[in-house]
UniProtKB/Swiss-Prot annotation:
GO MF term (any one): metal ion binding
The protein, known as: DNA ligase
Annotated function: DNA ligase that catalyzes the formation of phosphodiester linkages between 5'-phosphoryl and 3'-hydroxyl groups in double-stranded DNA using NAD as a coenzyme and as the energy source for the reaction. It is essential for DNA replication and repair of damaged DNA.
Residue ranges constituting the BRCT domain according to the UniProt record: 626-705
UniProt catalytic activity: NAD(+) + (deoxyribonucleotide)n-3'-hydroxyl + 5'-phospho-(deoxyribonucleotide)m = (deoxyribonucleotide)n+m + AMP + beta-nicotinamide D-nucleotide
């Protein structure tokens, strides 16, 4: 799968990539977790998922409702009974270089309010490449074994797990309830012996030890599992009736005392330097190990700190998997293409002589932006020793977690004599409009707006995407077809299709892939989407910098479309209350706010939106409600120094109780929680009559929740 460069990725291209990534990762998840027959390598899966996350971080408003970053594993197979995990079996965030590890440590320190000199210990352990398994013991007896599944619901493989020698049936001196979690794997020697037996029997060979282990554990006949040489490493736990220890290391040692195999390469480390040193030691031993590993896992050692750090939607904040590096390859740069995205960004893509990198044939790679091609970074500093990139060059291609292959270097010794410097286009290759680069922006953008066919089509594709209007039967291919034929040029046209072509349905049903039934189904599907929540409408508009999360926040803030539209028009005056009110929304900064009022302030854009809304029944946004919470649906601002929790912890706690945390005080603020040094926010709250609490008052308000 080929992708455009990330740094120069347009919103149009980003949305298209996210759609492709969602489909690919969904198929890969099912193949890997449910069918035990991977269709891509683990490294490629990590790379695709990281690429997906990178696009979402750059274009948060493009995040899909079914985003792969919010998913763990795959749905359990119908062949096994289901097990609901009392504590979810989550995945791990990934680190791919030393900078990622340092960032991980700094994020933890910031969240906990720890200075750089305060002690912070971690454990490091090899990341076993196998199948995750949860074992439940009650009164020392194994009563249930379940795969991870989708993280919330797994498969009951109890009888199969009983056949694995490393999994004890009975344990002593353990908590009354104990869930042991770890990895089922197969050693290299056992894998080779198993495949030899398979070959002798004329049976299908396994591709690798991980596939063999997963396929063996998930047999419907436990006798087959028993015939396979499976092993188990314990490294974590789920539900406990009593703690195993105060630290990760103590708990692992306790699991070992119960008779479980734990990895002898697990070490305690202090700080990123020791973590990286241990990473290098494990990497050096990787080739000599008799089992597969694909990285090193770092975890905060102190379990109280783990609890304070908590979890994101699919990963713990207190752990990360440091993956082993990707591969490099050299090949010829045969051309440079320019792709135009939904927001007009011009993205250069290297067309390469196909080369295998990390087990995947690569023919396209990112060139980021015009500065990168010229040998500079976004700040104008020299990179690659100032070497520019030219068509005909022999270039180094790098694949890592960013999924999109990158052109990393140039071999000047092999540069053709007739190679000329690349001149980045000053006009859009799709519509011919000027392509301008604003100060501080790394990307050159087409100024054509909706007259640019590339932008118009990508905006329409975004409009019908799953996280937006999600109209059955109207996907990217149909949008391209209808736009080309002049049937749809703006979103409102979608909702007048029946009026314009319903009586002449023959025009649609005679097309390839269409019949009378499918045509009528499309019209019905469009009508079904006339009623739409405000948040989805805002997201569907495809406003630059406004993703799903921001759309939800904005919708909750203004409640109705009329209020939103009027406020955005009023916010054109940046000295007025409407502008300040927009900025008071947590997560809405100056750049995003400017983008919103620009989109709503242009006469042509607003007219197009009004034509759309005239076809719809836009549902008001409802405030978040949390039963029993005195702050549900309230707006809270934190200021000053908090002594009993960090700002990040306070924000996370408030949001978990249904509150909306804003960054500034306004007339819509319900509570100001002020510590020492509150300053201007406390003064403004007093002027507006906003209820002000100190930290103890806030904790008393939410006590017991």
């Amino acid at each position: 799968m080929d992708f455009a460069p990330l740094d120069s990725l347009t919103e149009k291209a980003a949305k298209k990539e996210l759609s492709k990534l969602a489909d690919l990762l969904d198929q890969a998840n099912t193949a890997y977790h449910a069918n035990d027959a991977p269709i891509i390598s683990d490294a490629d899966f990590d790379a695709y998922k990281r690429r997906n996350l990178a696009i979402e971080e750059r274009f948060p408003h493009l995040k899909r409702a079914d985003s792969p970053t919010d998913r763990v594993g795959a749905a359990p197979s119908a062949g096994f009974s289901k097990v609901v995990h009392s504590i979810a079996m989550l995945s791990l965030a990934n680190a791919f270089d030393e900078a990622d590890v340092s960032d991980f440590v700094q994020r933890i320190r910031k969240h906990l309010g720890l200075s750089d000199i305060e002690a912070l210990s971690f454990t490091s352990e090899p990341k076993i490449d196998g199948l995750s398994l949860s074992l439940r013991y009650e009164n020392g007896t194994l009563v249930q074994a379940a795969t991870r599944g989708d993280g919330a619901i797994g498969e009951n493989v109890t009888e199969n797990a009983r056949t694995i020698p490393d999994i004890p049936e009975q344990i002593s001196n353990a908590p009354d309830v104990l869930e042991v979690r770890g990895e089922v794997y197969m050693s290299h020697a056992d894998f080779e012996a198993l495949n030899a037996r398979q070959a002798s029997a004329g049976a299908k060979l396994f591709a690798n030890p991980r596939n063999a282990a997963a396929g063996s554990l998930r047999q419907l006949d436990a006798r087959i599992t028993q015939s396979r040489p499976l092993r188990f490493f314990a490294y974590a736990w789920g539900t406990l009736s009593e703690p195993l220890g105060k630290t990760q290391m103590q708990s692992i040692e306790r699991l070992q005392s119960f008779g479980f195999q734990t990895n002898d390469l697990t070490e305690k480390c202090n700080g990123p330097e020791e973590l990286l040193a241990q990473y290098r030691r494990i990497e050096e031993r990787r080739a000599s190990l008799d089992y597969d590993i694909d990285g090193v896992v770092y975890k905060v050692d102190d379990l109280d700190l783990q609890r304070r750090l908590g979890f994101r939607s699919t990963t713990p904040r207190w752990a990360i998997a440091h993956k082993f590096p990707a591969e490099l390859a050299w090949t010829e740069l045969q051309g440079i293409d320019i792709q135009v995205g939904r927001t007009g960004a011009l993205s250069p893509v290297a067309r390469l002589k196909p080369v295998t990198v990390g087990g995947v044939v690569v023919s396209n790679a990112t060139l980021h932006n015009e500065d990168y091609i010229a040998g500079r970074d976004n700040k104008g500093d020299v990179i690659r020793g100032g070497k520019d990139i030219r068509v005909g060059d022999f270039v180094q291609v790098y694949r890592a977690g960013d999924v999109i292959p990158k052109v990393a270097d140039v071999d000047l010794k092999k540069r053709p004599a007739d190679a000329i410097p690349y001149v980045f286009p000053a006009t859009c290759p799709e519509c011919g409009s000027d392509a301008l680069r604003e100060a501080g922006d790394a990307v050159r953008r087409c100024t054509g707006g909706l007259i640019c066919p590339a932008q118009a089509v990508e905006r329409l594709k975004h409009f019908v995407s799953r996280a937006a209007f999600d109209i059955d039967g109207l996907g990217a291919k149909q949008i391209e077809q209808f736009y080309k034929d002049g049937w749809i040029s703006e979103p409102a046209d979608i909702f007048t299709l029946r009026d314009r072509f319903g009586s002449g349905i023959q025009q649609l049903k005679n097309r390839d892939g269409w019949g009378e039934k499918s045509a009528n189904n499309l019209f019905d599907a469009i009508d079904d989407k006339r009623q739409i929540p405000l948040a989805r409408l805002i997201f569907a508009l495809g406003i630059r910098h406004v993703g799903e999360a921001a759309s939800n926040l904005i919708a909750q803030h203004y409640s109705t479309f009329d209020a939103f539209e009027k406020s955005m028009l009023a916010a054109q005056d940046k000295d007025g209350e409407a502008w300040d009110d927009l900025l008071s929304i947590d997560g809405v900064g100056t750049v995003m706010a400017q983008s919103v009022i620009h989109a709503m302030g242009q006469a042509a854009e607003r007219a197009s939106i009004d034509r759309l809304v005239a076809q719809l029944d836009v549902q008001p946004s409802e405030a978040v409600v949390t039963d029993g919470s005195p702050v549900a649906g309230k707006t809270v601002v934190f200021t000053g120094t908090l002594s009993k929790m960090t700002r990040a912890e306070a924000k996370s706690r408030a949001e978990s109780l249904g509150a909306r945390v804003a960054g500034s005080v306004s007339a819509k603020t319900d509570f100001l929680v002020a510590g020492p040094g509150a300053g201007s926010k406390a003064k403004k709250a007093a002027e507006l009559g906003v209820q002000t609490l100190d930290e103890d008052g806030w904790l008393a308000l939410i006590e017991g929740l």
